[in-house]
Amino acid sequence: MQFKPAVTALVSAVALATLLSGCKKEEAAPAAQAPQVGVVTIQPQAFTLTSELPGRTSAYRVAEVRPQVNGIILKRLFKEGSEVKEGQQLYQIDPAVYEATLANAKANLLATRSLAERYKQLIDEQAVSKQEYDDANAKRLQAEASLKSAQIDLRYTKVLAPISGRIGRSSFTEGALVSNGQTDAMATIQQLDPIYVDVTQSTAELLKLRRDLESGQLQKAGNNAASVQLVLEDGSLFKQEGRLEFSEVAVDETTGSVTLRALFPNPDHTLLPGMFVHARLKAGVNANAILAPQQGVTRDLKGAPTALVVNQENKVELRQLKASRTLGSDWLIEEGLNPGDRLITEGLQYVRPGVEVKVSDATNVKKPAGPDQANAAKADAKAE
């Protein structure tokens, strides 16, 4: 019975130690702090939709120079690659044969005309029959037609430019024999001012644009609804602005695209037929576009765009987005974000949906662009 006080003391000591240990653990566990995130407040802004489409230049008018009579070329009267005017003489074909033919036609006309006039007097005197007079008059008419034909052939020995423009390389030299109806053109003239640019656009993009315009989601771009800018192969911007001319009704079955034709002034002949270019088309204006910084848009396992926003209770929400294209460093959002939403762009790795957070203005993105800045950046937008 003497060991009971010792056991009691030992138990008391252990209990006291356990109690003190629990108190220390409670004191060592601080309260969890809300993570800090940087947000951007979404604001709607006017945005001109643009599409950059590949295309090629083509001459406004093209004419092949061909001979209309047979003969030997005596002279070439132009410089290859020069500008020629409509009606300017380009070649001289040997006219000797046609001059002789013309002289013969004139003589024949004099003879048949004289005979017809004599028969007309004689028929009144009944010295010749009506049939003889009719035959003589018909020969006179044939002689007049032969004379006109000879004059035309002689005129065709001077080969003239059918249109104004830049003439290319001559396929024939002095001394070469050319003939009416030959397959090879003597030269080709191309009118380069103005000049066409043929670009392609998918039918899906055209249909979407038309639906948006009909529903009122997009407004026509005012007087610039059909304006087109041109980017050259070296990346520079062509200084002249063009206008949209028409859209082909037929769809290319192999590519599923339609061809748009734009017309550009080309006074300096900077653009030449066959050049590869990109046309920037101003398709319409979205007066309340939602632009989200790319830092705040991520992809889920399926590749769909998502975003995290902070609600009124300062808790994180997950949003599924529908993004159509990029504009500089922003995404154009069609669904999933609304004006006033606070989009998280900083601290995404520290939060998840449902977590309460502390909010501050993001420092890793630029402030939303004003109207002038937005218009300056529109040229960088490309359809995905």
Swiss-Prot record:
Residues 1-22 form the signal peptide. Gene3D superfamilies: 2.40.30.170, 2.40.420.20, 2.40.50.100, Helix hairpin bin (1.10.287.470). GO terms for biological process: response to antibiotic. Induction: The ttgABC operon is repressed by toluene; this is mediated by TtgR. The ttgABC operon is induced in response to chloramphenicol and tetracycline. Residues 115-155 form a coiled coil. A lipid is attached at C23 (S-diacylglycerol cysteine). It is found in: Cell inner membrane. GO terms for molecular function: transmembrane transporter activity. GO terms for cellular component: plasma membrane. Its main location: membrane. A lipid is attached at C23 (N-palmitoyl cysteine). Residues 368-378 have a biased composition (Low complexity). Belongs to the membrane fusion protein (MFP) (TC 8.A.1) family. NCBIfam families: RND_mfp. This is Toluene efflux pump periplasmic linker protein TtgA. It comes from Pseudomonas putida (strain DOT-T1E).
